[in-house]
C-alpha cells in the first residue's frame, strides 16, 4: 500500500539483482540523491515501462458506460434487503461511472436519494434529488422523487417549502394528465398521508446543525506558540545532541491539554487493504467497499453521497467545492495517472502531490537556491554531519565576515519560527544513508517512471506549433537532457525516502457489528497517509505521554498524562508496550525508523527477562497461577504440584481456541445469536482451563458474549460479560487509555438500553473523562455519550430500582 504493488516491487528487485556489480556499487556509493536518481533512471528501459503499464491497467479507474446499470441493479438488491448503507455505496459506484447530464447519472442519484432517505440523511437526500433533476431525471418518474423531496422537507421542519413542493407536484398532475395515469395508488395515498402529517405539525426541530465548526472553535489552541505554528505555548522546540530536534514542555501540562492542532501539509487517501480486481468476466466491476468509496478524497470527510470526478471513476469527493479544489491543486495532473499511482503506491503518490501542491516552479527555486549555496551532499543528506546547522534562506550570501550564517534549528525561517510549510517538509530527514541500496533503486525507478508519464502528458498538452525544432522536442521528452525533470525527480525521490520515517498514519474509528445491532464494536482503521511537519518533530516512546486523534485532515495531539516542565513531549510511532513485547517493538523500530529504542518501557521490560507479556500468559490448570518458563512451562506457585507442560502444546491449544472464536464471531455477524452464545460459552470454559485471566483472548470472548447478549436483549448478562472484557482491557492498556474509553462507551450503551439509570450515568461520566484525554468534543462517541446523558437526566424520577 505504501510501497508499490508486489508484482512491480518484485520486478524491480529482480532487476537490481541482475545488474552488474559495478553498477550496483555506483548506485550504492552515490553521494547525492541527484546521482542516485540519474544513475537509476538511466536503467529504466521501455520493456520495464510496458510491464508497469500492464500492471496499471489492472486498476479500473476509467469510466465504463455499462457499469451504471450493473451497480444500480446491485444497489437495488441491497435496498430490497433493507441494507440502505450498502445500497447507497453501490449507487455511488454507479454515479462515479456515469457521464454528466445522462439518464444513468440521474437514475443513480435518484436511487441513492431513496437510500439516504431511509437512513435519515434528509439534507443529503435533498441534494441528491436536486442532482438527479439537474442531470435530466425522466419526466415519467418525477412524482416519486418530488414526493420524497416533500417528505424530507417535512422531516426537517421546513413546512413552507414542503407545501410548495406538494403544490408543484399536484399542479404537474393537472398540467400533464399522462402523469396521473402512471401515478400508483400507493403514491397517491402517501401524498394524502403527508398532507395530513403537515397539518398536525406546527413545526419540527431543525436537523442537527453543523456544530463541527463550533466544536473546532471551542477546541482551538488557547494561546498560539510564537516559535511553532499550530502548537500550544506550553511546548517549545529544542535540539538535543543525540536526538536532534524535539519538543519539550515549557510549563506543567495537565492531562487532556491540547498541545498541537495541525492540518496535514499533504495527504493521500489509502486505497484500502483489498487487492486490485481480477479481469474475469464475472468480476469486471467490483462491488467491494473500500475507504475510497466512503471518504472524500480531499478532506477525508465520511460521506455516502460522493461527488465523482468527471474524468475518472476513482476520485470521489464530499462536495462540488472539494472536487473543484482538488482539481485545481493536483487532480487535473493525477486524473489520467490513476492506475499508475495505485500501482506505484501511496508514498510515490504523496511525493507527486506534494510537488504539485507546492508548484514545480517553487520546488525548482528552493532546490536551485540550495544548490547555489551548499553542496549537493548537504542538500540530499542534511543529517550527515551537523543536525543543528541549516541554511538561512533569507540571506543573499552563505557567509558573512568569514562566519557561516545559520539558523539555530533546521526547518525554521530567518526569524527562527518553525511553520507548516514546504521549508519544514523539505528539512525532514530522508535518512538516505540508512536505506538499503535496493530500496533507493526501487524508489528512484518508481519516480523516474512517473516523471516520464508526466513528460508524456505535458508534451501532449503542448501545441505542435510551439515546438520549433527537434532539440526542443528532445529536451521535452528526455529526462536526462531536461534539468527541470531531474529537479522534480530528485525532489520526489527525497520525499519518498522521507516518508518511511515521517509519514503519519491518519486513522478513524469504524464501528462494526451485526445489522441492526444496538451495541457495536469499534476498531481503529488507517484512512490516509499525511505529512505533518510539526508533529514530525515528536520523538517516539513505547509508552508515550500524548495521544493523537483526527478529524478530517486535522491531527490533534493531547497530553494523555501530566507532563512536568522540561519533560519531553513523546508520541508513539506504532509499536506500543500494550500491543507488543519489547523484542518485537525493537525490531520494528530498528527496521523502519533506524534507531534502537531506549525509552523507559523498553529498559524496564528488557531487565525483567519475562517469558512474554501478561496478555499472552498461560495459567496452571490446577491452581490458576500463571505459568513460567520458556520452552517448558511450570506453575509459578511453589505449593502447586502440577507437572510441567510444553509451550508448544499450549500454543496449539490456543490456536484451536482462536479458530473456534472466529467461527462464533461469524455466527454473531450472521445473526445466529443463540448458536454464537453457545459456541462462545464453550470457548470461555476452555479458555479458563489454561489461559491467564488477563489474556487477550479471554477478553475477546467476553466481548463477543456481551454483544450477543445485547443483541438478544439480555442487558444484565451483556453488562456482566463486558465488565470482564473491561478488566482485561484495563490491565493491558491502562485505566486512562483510549482503548478503555471505547470499552466504557460500550458499557454505557448497555446500561442505557437496559434502563439502568444510575449505572449508565456513572459509566457515561467515566467514559467522557477518559475519552476527553484523547479526543476532542467533536468525537462521535463523546457526542453520543452526551446525548445519552441528556436523555437520562430528562427522565422523571422513579422509585423502581435498576432494570439490571
Curated annotation (Swiss-Prot):
<keyword id="KW-0479">Metal-binding</keyword>
<feature type="domain" description="SET">
    <location>
        <begin position="233"/>
        <end position="574"/>
    </location>
</feature>
<keyword id="KW-0539">Nucleus</keyword>
<comment type="subunit">
    <text>Interacts (via MYND-type zinc finger) with HDAC1.</text>
</comment>
<keyword id="KW-0808">Transferase</keyword>
<keyword id="KW-0862">Zinc</keyword>
<feature type="binding site">
    <location>
        <begin position="112"/>
        <end position="114"/>
    </location>
    <ligand>
        <name>S-adenosyl-L-methionine</name>
    </ligand>
</feature>
<feature type="binding site">
    <location>
        <position position="322"/>
    </location>
    <ligand>
        <name>Zn(2+) 1</name>
    </ligand>
</feature>
<feature type="binding site">
    <location>
        <position position="309"/>
    </location>
    <ligand>
        <name>Zn(2+) 2</name>
    </ligand>
</feature>
<feature type="binding site">
    <location>
        <position position="312"/>
    </location>
    <ligand>
        <name>Zn(2+) 2</name>
    </ligand>
</feature>
<feature type="zinc finger region" description="MYND-type">
    <location>
        <begin position="296"/>
        <end position="335"/>
    </location>
</feature>
<dbReference type="InterPro" id="IPR044421">
    <property type="entry name" value="SMYD4_SET"/>
</dbReference>
<feature type="binding site">
    <location>
        <position position="573"/>
    </location>
    <ligand>
        <name>S-adenosyl-L-methionine</name>
    </ligand>
</feature>
<dbReference type="Pfam" id="PF00856">
    <property type="entry name" value="SET"/>
</dbReference>
<dbReference type="GO" id="GO:0005634">
    <property type="term" value="C:nucleus"/>
</dbReference>
<comment type="similarity">
    <text>Belongs to the class V-like SAM-binding methyltransferase superfamily.</text>
</comment>
<dbReference type="GO" id="GO:0042826">
    <property type="term" value="F:histone deacetylase binding"/>
</dbReference>
<protein>
    <recommendedName>
        <fullName>Protein-lysine N-methyltransferase SMYD4</fullName>
        <ecNumber>2.1.1.-</ecNumber>
    </recommendedName>
</protein>
<dbReference type="InterPro" id="IPR002893">
    <property type="entry name" value="Znf_MYND"/>
</dbReference>
<keyword id="KW-0949">S-adenosyl-L-methionine</keyword>
<feature type="binding site">
    <location>
        <begin position="539"/>
        <end position="540"/>
    </location>
    <ligand>
        <name>S-adenosyl-L-methionine</name>
    </ligand>
</feature>
<feature type="binding site">
    <location>
        <position position="595"/>
    </location>
    <ligand>
        <name>S-adenosyl-L-methionine</name>
    </ligand>
</feature>
<feature type="binding site">
    <location>
        <position position="299"/>
    </location>
    <ligand>
        <name>Zn(2+) 1</name>
    </ligand>
</feature>
<feature type="binding site">
    <location>
        <position position="335"/>
    </location>
    <ligand>
        <name>Zn(2+) 2</name>
    </ligand>
</feature>
<dbReference type="InterPro" id="IPR046341">
    <property type="entry name" value="SET_dom_sf"/>
</dbReference>
<feature type="binding site">
    <location>
        <position position="427"/>
    </location>
    <ligand>
        <name>S-adenosyl-L-methionine</name>
    </ligand>
</feature>
<dbReference type="GO" id="GO:0008168">
    <property type="term" value="F:methyltransferase activity"/>
</dbReference>
<dbReference type="GO" id="GO:0032259">
    <property type="term" value="P:methylation"/>
</dbReference>
<feature type="binding site">
    <location>
        <position position="331"/>
    </location>
    <ligand>
        <name>Zn(2+) 2</name>
    </ligand>
</feature>
<feature type="binding site">
    <location>
        <position position="318"/>
    </location>
    <ligand>
        <name>Zn(2+) 1</name>
    </ligand>
</feature>
<dbReference type="GO" id="GO:0007507">
    <property type="term" value="P:heart development"/>
</dbReference>
<dbReference type="InterPro" id="IPR011990">
    <property type="entry name" value="TPR-like_helical_dom_sf"/>
</dbReference>
<dbReference type="InterPro" id="IPR052097">
    <property type="entry name" value="SET-MYND_domain_protein"/>
</dbReference>
<dbReference type="InterPro" id="IPR001214">
    <property type="entry name" value="SET_dom"/>
</dbReference>
<keyword id="KW-0963">Cytoplasm</keyword>
<keyword id="KW-0863">Zinc-finger</keyword>
<comment type="function">
    <text>Protein-lysine N-methyltransferase. Monomethylates PRMT5, modulating its transcriptional activity. May also act as a histone methyltransferase. Plays a critical role in cardiac development. Acts as a key epigenetic regulator of gene expression during cardiac development via its dual activities as a methyltransferase and negative regulator of HDAC1.</text>
</comment>
<feature type="binding site">
    <location>
        <position position="296"/>
    </location>
    <ligand>
        <name>Zn(2+) 1</name>
    </ligand>
</feature>
<dbReference type="Pfam" id="PF01753">
    <property type="entry name" value="zf-MYND"/>
</dbReference>
<dbReference type="GO" id="GO:0005737">
    <property type="term" value="C:cytoplasm"/>
</dbReference>
<keyword id="KW-0489">Methyltransferase</keyword>
<dbReference type="GO" id="GO:0008270">
    <property type="term" value="F:zinc ion binding"/>
</dbReference>
Amino acid at each position: 500500500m505504501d510501497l508499490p504493488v508486489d508484482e512491480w516491487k518484485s520486478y524491480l528487485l529482480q532487476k537490481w539483482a541482475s545488474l552488474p556489480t559495478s553498477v550496483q556499487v555506483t548506485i550504492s556509493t552515490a553521494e547525492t540523491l541527484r546521482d542516485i536518481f540519474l544513475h537509476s533512471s538511466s536503467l529504466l528501459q521501455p520493456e520495464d515501462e510496458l510491464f508497469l503499464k500492464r500492471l496499471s491497467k489492472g486498476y479500473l479507474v476509467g469510466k465504463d458506460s455499462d457499469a451504471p446499470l450493473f451497480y444500480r441493479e446491485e444497489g437495488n438488491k441491497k435496498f430490497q434487503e433493507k441494507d440502505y448503507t450498502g445500497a447507497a455505496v453501490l449507487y455511488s459506484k454507479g454515479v462515479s461511472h456515469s457521464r454528466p447530464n445522462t439518464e444513468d447519472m440521474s437514475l443513480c442519484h435518484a436511487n441513492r436519494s431513496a437510500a439516504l432517505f431511509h437512513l435519515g440523511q434528509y439534507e443529503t437526500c435533498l441534494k441528491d434529488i436536486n442532482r438527479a433533476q439537474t442531470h435530466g431525471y425522466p419526466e415519467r418518474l418525477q412524482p416519486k422523487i418530488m414526493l420524497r423531496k416533500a417528505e424530507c422537507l417535512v422531516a426537517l421542519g421546513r413546512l413552507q417549502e414542503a407545501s410548495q413542493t406538494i403544490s408543484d407536484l399536484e399542479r404537474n398532475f393537472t398540467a400533464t394528465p399522462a402523469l396521473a395515469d402512471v401515478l400508483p395508488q400507493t403514491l397517491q395515498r402517501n401524498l394524502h398521508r403527508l398532507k395530513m402529517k403537515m397539518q398536525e405539525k406546527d413545526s419540527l426541530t431543525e436537523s442537527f446543525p453543523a456544530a463541527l465548526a463550533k466544536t473546532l472553535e471551542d477546541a482551538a489552541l488557547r494561546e498560539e506558540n510564537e516559535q511553532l505554528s499550530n502548537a500550544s505555548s506550553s511546548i517549545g522546540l529544542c535540539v538535543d545532541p543525540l536526538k536532534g530536534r524535539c519538543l519539550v514542555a515549557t510549563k506543567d501540562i495537565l492531562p487532556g491539554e491540547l498541545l498541537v492542532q495541525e492540518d496535514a501539509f499533504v495527504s493521500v487517501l489509502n486505497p484500502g487493504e483489498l487487492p486490485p480486481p481480477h479481469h474475469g468476466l464475472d468480476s469486471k466491476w467490483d462491488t467491494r467497499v473500500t475507504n475510497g468509496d466512503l471518504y472524500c478524497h480531499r478532506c477525508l470527510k465520511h460521506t455516502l453521497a460522493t461527488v465523482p470526478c468527471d474524468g475518472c471513476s476513482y476520485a470521489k469527493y464530499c462536495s462540488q467545492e472539494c472536487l473543484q479544489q482538488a482539481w485545481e491543486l493536483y487532480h487535473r495532473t493525477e486524473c489520467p495517472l490513476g492506475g499508475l499511482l495505485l500501482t506505484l503506491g501511496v508514498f510515490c503518490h504523496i511525493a507527486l502531490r506534494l510537488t504539485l501542491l507546492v508548484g514545480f516552479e517553487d520546488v525548482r527555486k528552493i532546490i536551485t537556491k540550495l544548490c547555489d549555496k551548499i553542496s549537493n551532499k548537504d542538500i540530499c543528506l542534511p543529517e550527515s554531519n551537523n543536525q543543528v546547522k541549516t541554511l538561512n534562506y533569507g540571506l543573499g550570501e552563505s557567509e558573512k565576515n568569514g562566519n557561516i550564517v545559520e539558523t539555530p534549528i533546521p526547518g525554521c525561517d530567518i526569524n527562527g519560527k518553525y511553520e507548516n510549510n514546504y521549508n519544514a517538509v523539505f528539512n525532514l530527514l530522508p535518512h538516505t544513508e540508512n536505506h538499503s541500496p535496493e530500496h533507493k533503486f526501487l524508489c528512484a525507478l518508481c519516480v523516474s517512471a512517473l516523471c516520464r508519464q508526466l513528460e508524456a502528458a505535458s508534451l501532449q498538452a503542448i501545441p505542435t506549433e510551439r515546438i520549433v525544432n527537434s532539440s526542443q522536442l528532445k529536451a521535452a521528452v528526455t529526462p536526462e537532457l531536461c534539468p527541470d525533470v531531474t529537479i522534480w525527480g530528485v525532489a520526489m525521490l527525497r520525499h519518498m525516502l522521507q516518508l518511511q520515517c515521517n509519514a503519519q498514519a491518519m486513522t478513524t474509528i469504524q464501528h462494526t457489528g451485526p445489522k441492526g445491532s444496538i451495541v457495536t464494536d469499534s476498531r481503529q482503521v488507517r484512512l490516509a497517509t499525511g505529512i505533518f511537519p510539526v508533529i514530525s518533530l515528536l520523538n517516539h516512546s513505547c509508552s508515550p505521554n500524548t495521544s493523537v486523534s483526527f478529524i478530517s485532515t486535522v491531527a490533534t495531539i493531547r497530553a494523555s498524562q501530566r507532563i512536568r516542565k522540561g519533560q519531553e513531549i513523546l508520541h508513539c510511532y506504532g509499536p506500543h508496550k500494550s500491543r507488543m513485547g519489547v523484542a518485537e517493538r525493537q525490531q520494528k523500530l530498528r527496521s523502519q525508523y533506524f534507531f534502537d529504542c531506549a525509552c523507559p518501557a523498553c529498559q524496564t521490560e528488557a531487565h525483567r527477562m519475562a517469558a512474554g507479556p501478561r496478555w499472552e500468559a498461560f495459567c496452571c490448570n490446577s491452581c490458576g497461577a500463571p505459568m513460567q518458563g520458556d520452552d517448558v512451562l511450570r506453575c509459578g506457585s511453589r505449593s502447586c504440584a502440577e507437572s510441567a507442560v510444553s509451550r508448544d502444546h499450549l500454543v496449539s491449544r490456543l490456536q484451536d481456541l482462536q479458530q473456534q472464536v472466529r467461527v462464533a464471531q461469524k455466527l454473531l455477524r450472521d445473526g445466529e445469536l443463540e448458536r454464537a452464545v453457545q459456541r462462545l460459552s464453550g470457548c470461555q470454559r476452555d479458555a479458563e482451563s489454561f489461559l491467564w485471566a488477563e489474556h487477550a483472548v479471554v477478553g475477546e470472548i467476553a466481548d463477543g458474549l456481551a454483544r450477543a447478549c445485547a443483541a438478544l436483549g439480555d442487558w444484565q448478562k451483556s453488562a456482566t460479560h463486558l465488565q470482564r472484557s473491561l478488566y482485561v482491557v484495563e490491565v493491558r492498556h491502562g485505566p486512562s487509555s483510549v482503548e478503555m474509553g471505547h470499552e466504557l462507551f460500550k458499557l454505557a450503551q448497555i446500561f442505557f438500553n437496559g434502563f439502568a439509570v444510575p449505572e449508565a450515568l456513572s459509566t457515561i461520566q467515566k467514559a467522557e473523562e477518559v475519552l476527553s484525554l484523547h479526543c476532542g468534543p467533536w468525537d462521535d462517541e463523546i457526542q453520543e455519550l452526551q446525548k445519552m446523558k441528556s436523555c437520562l437526566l430528562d427522565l422523571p424520577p422513579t422509585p423502581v430500582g435498576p432494570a439490571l
